UniProtKB/Swiss-Prot annotation:
Keywords associated with the record: Ligase, Phosphoprotein, Pyridine nucleotide biosynthesis
EC numbers, comma separated: 6.3.4.21
Pathway listed: Cofactor biosynthesis; NAD(+) biosynthesis; nicotinate D-ribonucleotide from nicotinate: step 1/1
HAMAP family reported for this sequence: NAPRTase
Single GO biological process annotation from the record: NAD biosynthetic process via the salvage pathway
Modified residues (Phosphohistidine): 221
Catalytic activity: nicotinate + 5-phospho-alpha-D-ribose 1-diphosphate + ATP + H2O = nicotinate beta-D-ribonucleotide + ADP + phosphate + diphosphate
Protein role: Catalyzes the synthesis of beta-nicotinate D-ribonucleotide from nicotinate and 5-phospho-D-ribose 1-phosphate at the expense of ATP.
Family listed: Belongs to the NAPRTase family.
GO MF annotation terms: nicotinate phosphoribosyltransferase activity
PANTHER family: NICOTINATE PHOSPHORIBOSYLTRANSFERASE (PTHR11098:SF1)
GO-annotated cellular components: cytosol
Name of the protein described by the UniProt record: Nicotinate phosphoribosyltransferase
Length: 398
């Protein structure tokens, strides 16, 4: 098995934008909150054999820090505050927070510590697992092969949609976590930037910086999950998460994720104030057409013109699904498409990993994600799921 005497992750910025956005909010509001996160492989892959290589790479991450040039780049964004950026400049990964084991062939990872520190581990660890796995299983694959396949997809896309008005089409790279490799992600996004006028940005801060793209992201499920134990009242946890985000960012970064406790419960909390204050909402599970119709109906019921709002679709998209949703909604609401694995690990005969790292505890107590797709629901404590369902008036079948 290939050994690495160099770090695969070479910069603190090689991660998703929403990690910095959430980290800043945690820094100002929840400095002393501690969390536990665990790795989950949703597929049949046996990944434990890579544990020692992964651990070597994690150890190398302890030397990463924000360079002066990167720090100056971060200061160009109005939503980052000086105190946070000064702290981030001194930030170092604490490798004692991460436990990695090969348990009978299964890869076990547990990350624990202060939320403001633990929050940055998820994306690089997932991208490391993905790259180590793919380089071992597909050593013949190069970034040139990935770009050649992308070129074929783009040619087919333009041919099939030559009669479609694409003037409102916007896509964003969301592919860091499950990329084939960093080189493939960079090459794919550079090619899109050069040849695909509908690319507006990337979730990867490093790639956005060097390719001069807009970094895009808001918050992840963990933001809402942690509030389940931060809030003194479980039923008000989602509302507190939405309020705290607005207090930190106001009109910036105001796209809200809807499916931590199902879309229906989210909309019950997403009242007129939130619906006006947030620029839009993000789809990450469940039927995207039903979700989009429900979102538009919600805005209309509150007397809000949907064309002033944005729907961001980001659940397992490819070009075919994207254009179908675009045709359905583009004249009724602003839409953005976040495409991940189908950009950065879409290579013939390569099967991407289906891996995640999710919060399991906050302040020593369980948290849950009750998705609109049953396969994405996650919690280690069945009793807490019952409490959450009772608080939000949900069926236990979610």
């Amino acid at each position: 098995m290939k050994q690495y005497n160099y770090p695969i992750v070479k910069t603190l910025l090689d991660t998703d934008a929403y990690k910095f956005y959430m980290q800043q909010a945690v820094f100002y509001h929840y400095k002393n909150v501690d969390v536990v996160a665990e790795f989950i492989c949703r597929g049949p892959n046996i990944l434990g054999c890579y544990s020692h290589i992964l651990l070597d790479q994690i150890n190398m991450m302890s030397s990463l820090s924000l360079s002066h040039e990167e720090y100056l780049y971060m200061t160009t964004f109005p939503f980052f505050k000086k105190e946070y950026l000064h702290w981030l400049k001194k930030f170092r990964y604490n490798i004692t927070q991460v436990k990695v084991d090969n348990y009978h062939g299964q890869l076990h990872i547990r990350i624990s510590g202060l939320w403001k520190e633990v929050i940055l581990w998820e994306v690089p660890i997932l991208s490391l697992i993905s790259e180590i796995f793919h380089r071992h299983c597909y050593p013949e694959i190069t970034s040139n092969i990935a770009v050649q396949h992308l070129n074929k997809k783009l040619k087919e896309f333009f041919k099939k949609n030559r009669d479609v008005d694409l003037s409102r089409l916007k896509i964003v790279d969301f592919g860091t976590r499950r990329r084939f490799s960093y080189d493939v992600q960079y090459s794919i996004i550079k090619r899109l930037k050069d040849t695909f006028p509908f690319l507006i940005g990337s979730s990867n801060y490093h790639i956005s910086r060097i390719l001069k793209l807009l970094p895009v992201g808001t918050q992840a499920h963990e933001w809402f999950q942690a509030h389940q134990q931060i809030s003194s009242n479980l039923r008000n946890s989602q509302t507190l998460a939405l309020k705290t985000w607005l207090s930190q960012y106001n009109q910036h970064l105001s796209i809200a994720l809807t499916d931590c406790i199902t879309m229906d419960s989210f909309l019950r909390d997403f009242n007129l104030f939130f619906s006006k204050s947030y620029q839009g909402i993000r789809h990450d599970s469940g039927d995207p057409v039903k979700w989009g119709e429900k979102a538009i109906e919600h805005y209309e019921r509150l007397g809000i013109d949907p064309t002033t709002k944005t729907l961001l679709f980001s659940d397992n998209l490819n070009f075919r699904k994207m254009i179908s949703l675009y045709k359905k909604f583009n004249n009724r609401v602003n839409i953005i498409f976040g495409i991940g694995t189908k950009l950065t690990c879409d290579i013939p005969n390569v099967k991407p990993l289906n891996i995640v790292i999710k919060l399991v505890k906050c302040n020593g107590k369980p948290v849950a994600k009750l998705s609109d797709s049953p396969g994405k629901t996650f919690c280690l404590d069945r009793n807490f799921i019952k409490s959450l369902c009772k608080a939000f008036d949900l069926s236990l079948t979610v």
